[in-house]
Structures are given as structure tokens and as C-alpha cells.
Amino acid sequence: MGELTKLISAWEEYTQKNGTASATAFCMYYLAQESNNDLFGGLTPPDIDTTFAKLIGRLANMQTAYSKMALQELPGFELEWFYFLNTIYHLKEVRKTQVIQYNFTEQTTGIDILNKLKNLGYIAERTDPEDKRAKLVSVTKTGEKILFKVYQLLHKPTLLMYNDIDHKDKQVVVNILKDTETKHQEILSTVKQKSIDDLLSETLGEEKMAAIMQEREKMFRHWNAKRLKEK
């Protein structure tokens, strides 16, 4: 397919979906699509939400991979230990259950990590005076020492990934995402036995959720047909 034919086909497809389309709006849309094609090796996700989620997810996976590389300087130290130590350090003295919830960890896995940190002398534990059934944990001097060492190591992946991005651009992204992070921290800490559909219904309402899912099915069918046509 020639470049001009490709552009005309894209314009026709765009105008069918957007009756009052302008050339400027189309150009912005087309450039965004082409950019996403390059980003994901030609297999562009069917909508901007999925593109957004995929990009953030891949960046998170890359950060994890680089972080594990950096921690090779501390043989035996697990990345999950850092998350727990960091949480306890910033929350001061805190209940075990709060640490586990904050890190979205299964109860048994979280208890296992906390026990390892305690056995290594990185955290101390005492009974909560307000609730004898609960345990409070805090970071020890030994824990602080190892935590500050890990801070230095884990700055390397951050530097590698994000140093080239302009500070103002990074601040814009932080401003956009911080409320979402806070909102879902609260949701996940109280989720208990709810399903993802329960959470969607509570957040969007059942009617809106059904309409979105129906539109999503149509979008996916269109996207899949387009993908097969381009093969």
C-alpha cells in the first residue's frame, strides 16, 4: 500500500467515526497512532487506556529487572525486602497487617517476609499496647544501615531509565498520576473478598460499566479485523 493511499484510508476511517472531524484533529490522531505502532512493534493496543496501561506496566517490569541487577551487589537481599523495610521506615512503628496491605501482598507471603527481616535483625517487633493481638514493627539501626545502602543501589536503575526526561515533564506525569495512586492504594487496602467486577460496578455504576464493556467488544472486533487485514 502506497503512503498516500494509506493516509487516505486512515482519513476515511477516521471521518466515519468522527462526523465533524477536522484535519488538525486527524493529524494529531494519526501521528499518535503511528507513534504507538513504533512503540509496540506494529501491534498497537485497541485504545488509549490499554496503550497507557501497557506502557506503564512495561516500564514497571523494566524497573524491577534493573533493580534486581543493582541488588546483585548485596547477595541474598530480595527486592521485596526493600519494599517492606521502606514502608516500615516511613510509617515509623506500624502494625504488621498495615505493612502487608500497603504492599498488596498475600498475608502468608507478607508474614514470611517480615519474619525474615526480623531474623536478620532489620526490624524489631513488640505487642501493640492498644490491641494485644496485634504486633508493631519498626526498623532497627541495622535495618536503617542496610536500607540506606539499598537506596543508593536502587537509584541507579532510576537514573538509567529517567535521567534523560526533562524535569518539568516528569513533574507533569507525577501530578497526573499521584491521585490515581492514592485512590487505588485505598481501594486495594480494603478490597477483601471483592472481585474486579465488584470494584468496577462500585466505581462506575453497573449501567456505565455495561455500556463501556459493550463498546469495548466492538472496538476489539474492529481492531482485530484491522490487524488481520494488515498481515
Briefly describe each language-model feature range.
Residues 60, 75, 92, 103, ...:
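Flexible interhelical turns and helix-capping residues at alpha-helix boundaries
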Residues 68-105, 109:
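N-terminal helix-turn-helix DNA-binding core of bacterial DNA-binding proteins
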Residues 116-171:
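Charged, amphipathic alpha-helical coiled-coil/dimerization segments
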Residues 152-229:
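Terminal interaction helix/tail motif
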Residues 60, 147, 181-184:
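A structural signal for well-ordered alpha-helices, especially hydrophobic packing surfaces
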Residues 1-74:
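N-terminal leader segment of winged-helix/HTH proteins
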